[in-house]
């Protein structure tokens, strides 16, 4: 029996258990519960456990197009309960993934960091300021040493004073260690004045830093903006050269490389580009990985990319009579497309 095994052997076995199975093992005994909470074990599990891919949908809506459906099955729905009230479920409207954690924004504009595998939550408190609009939050971390990470949240906001030009903007950092917010006074605001952030489908958190697709309103160009949580500074990075600005979705591959899904406004052309690295000190290089052409609705908001099989799962968001949104999943390859 497992209880008769040495603790180091138990740790070695559990470090290879898939993350989705760890939650129900915590109730086995106090010793296992303490082990699964240990940061050293978390790092070991991250290195040795088999990698799993989860597709998270906030709403499930079926649309029958009278065609053969793709071989995709959605199961094991995730549900977040509110520890601050008696409500059964929290209505989540936005999600950002970082290092196995989900930064969730609720319908009533509250924010929580959630570990869906372990069922742990951390609700974020901040002072509500109704003079600030266009708020957005991003989750990242700094690597203190080989086995310790300090998580932070970046809060980006603009004032609602339309008379001021440029409009006042600010950045604040929340640190989990201190459980406090602080203003970033020396961030390079000037380089950000003429940038428009392109929404939820154009930001990702990767290796502790946050990346956005941004438009430069002066020269009608598009670039990649990174926020380094260690230096707490912004850095502009290059994108591949495109025929026109077009539409883009930012994502990542195996939590190691950035990827951009691009489709032209003028032609049915669609491309997927992948970076060679995300080293903050090196020049960002892109390579074309997938090039295809097809006619369909191409306003995608998110994607899951499987590099070896050259398959991408795209989520398409459409407004139906301006009342509700429906989501249609497309599976693309170099030769075929299934809806």
UniProtKB/Swiss-Prot annotation:
Give the matching CDD domains. F-box_AtFBW1-like (cd22157)
User: What PROSITE patterns does the record point to?
Assistant: FBOX (PS50181)
Limits of the F-box domain: 1-49
At the top level, the lineage of the source is Eukaryota
Q: Which NCBIfam families match?
A: F_box_assoc_1 (TIGR01640)
Listed name of the protein: F-box protein At3g22700
